[in-house]
Amino acid sequence: WGALGHATVAYVAQHYVSPEAASWAQGILGSSSSSYLASIASWADEYRLTSAGKWSASLHFIDAEDNPPTNCNVDYERDCGSSGCSISAIANYTQRVSDSSLSSENHAEALRFLVHFIGDMTQPLHDEAYAVGGNKINVTFDGYHDNLHSDWDTYMPQKLIGGHALSDAESWAKTLVQNIESGNYTAQAIGWIKGDNISEPITTATRWASDANALVCTVVMPHGAAALQTGDLYPTYYDSVIDTIELQIAKGGYRLANWINEIHGSEIAK
């Protein structure tokens, strides 16, 4: 996701993080701000663009070597790669964020990575190898020539919300939380975190990746890539996917909160 999506994931998470876990996370991040997760949600994207951080680029995705739209699947052993992927990163930073042998800066970095990667995993094209996760599928959206990946990350969410400031994200998150509390997500939200377990991070994160990857076949490119490269993706394609984008942002926030609550719970139990 882009800045708007990541901040919205973080604001949704802030709603569901327990007060005790919130204090713990604020302590790690050195922030008592009401945007303590949202304000650092895109740090990992900024970091990977620096010379010091370019090593981390592969951690933002897992390249599922499947065959959309005919066949979508994730295989951790097949797809992760020697330089690591989102799944291995979530496992690593889940361990590091509460490793007492590491420095407070290591803990803060680990939490910043977790906030970002758990969000990225719900963007279907971050769980797909085809055309570099859609980066090489050149399309037209709302009169602009861009690529399918950036439309999913940034331009379709911004079209829905109308901006990408923290205030826009906070407002979107409130709507998504309402949908979780008493709307069309209420019945399904418990399923978003079913079986999630910080002691089984590879299994859990692989399930998250598989959940989003399946949408590449059913929602992102159900008729293949070529079908998306004629005409403008707005409004017909946009209308067909925007509900899924909202759902995936909500999922990311709900899962992130549960993950932080679990990590904090395991800290207390030590």
Curated annotation (Swiss-Prot):
Enzyme nomenclature, EC number: 3.1.30.1
InterPro entries: PLipase_C/P1_nuclease_dom_sf, S1/P1nuclease
Listed GO MF terms: endonuclease activity; metal ion binding; nucleic acid binding
Keywords: Disulfide bond, Endonuclease, Glycoprotein, Hydrolase, Metal-binding, Nuclease, Secreted, Zinc
Site (Important for catalytic activity): D45, R48
Residues with attached carbohydrate: N92, N138, N184, N197
Free-text remark on how the cofactor is bound: Binds 3 divalent metal cations.
Any single GO CC term annotated in Swiss-Prot or TrEMBL for this entry: extracellular region
Annotated disulfide bonds: C72-C217, C80-C85
Binding-site list for substrate: 1-6, 45-51, 60-63, 73-78
Residues noted as binding a divalent metal cation 3 in the record, renumbered to the chain: W1, H6, D120
Entry binding sites for a divalent metal cation 1: D45, H60, H116, D120
Entry's Gene Ontology BP terms: DNA catabolic process
CDD domains in UniProt: S1-P1_nuclease
Assigned protein family: Belongs to the nuclease type I family.
Protein known as: Nuclease P1
